[in-house]
């Protein structure tokens, strides 16, 4: 189980990396919010502030990017790192992501679906889709963002390791 202070510190670091990915100044600001998603007795999803996380928890990242410039910007490409111990849950990104990376650093984003060649037990080479849980960074494409406007991107992840 991770306590709130450790969790907030860890995700603050990832938010800093996210901001550095596409903006080195205050031209675009970002705010990260993380919610634990649970289902109540009526089967309805609820989002609650994260205080602790445990293995198996579903979290939703909500990152809001704001254009602080006096004019619109184009081709904004927000990036969300997926920390170690966390797995991206397929098809939960809003708006839909168009590229992802299997590496926690660098700029090697690939169009989805990401494919890789694998060798079967009989020695045949096959091309298989990489499971979304292996994605280490997600990237969105925002064609334009008007001055003083914001866009929010979201993605859900599952905690697979919380014993830090």
Model-predicted regions and their roles:
Residues 8-18:
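Bacterial N-terminal signal peptides
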Residues 1-9:
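Bacterial N-terminal signal peptides that target proteins for export
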Residues 2-3, 22-164:
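Exported/extracytosolic protein signature
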């Amino acid at each position: 189980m991770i306590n709130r202070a450790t969790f907030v510190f860890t995700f603050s670091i990832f938010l800093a990396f996210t901001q550095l990915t596409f903006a080195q100044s205050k031209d675009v600001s970002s705010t990260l919010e993380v919610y634990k998603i649970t289902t109540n007795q009526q089967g309805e999803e609820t989002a609650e502030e994260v205080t602790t996380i445990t293995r198996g928890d579903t979290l939703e990242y909500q990152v809001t990017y704001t254009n602080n410039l006096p004019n619109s910007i184009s081709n904004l490409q927000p990036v969300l790192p997926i920390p170690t111990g966390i797995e991206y849950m397929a098809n939960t990104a809003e708006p839909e992501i168009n590229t992802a990376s299997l590496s926690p650093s660098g700029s090697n984003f690939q169009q989805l679906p990401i494919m890789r060649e694998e060798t079967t037990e009989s020695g045949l080479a096959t091309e298989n889709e990489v499971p979304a849980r292996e994605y280490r960074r997600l990237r969105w494409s925002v064609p334009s963002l008007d001055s003083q406007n914001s866009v929010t991107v979201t993605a859900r992840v599952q905690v697979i390791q919380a014993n830090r």
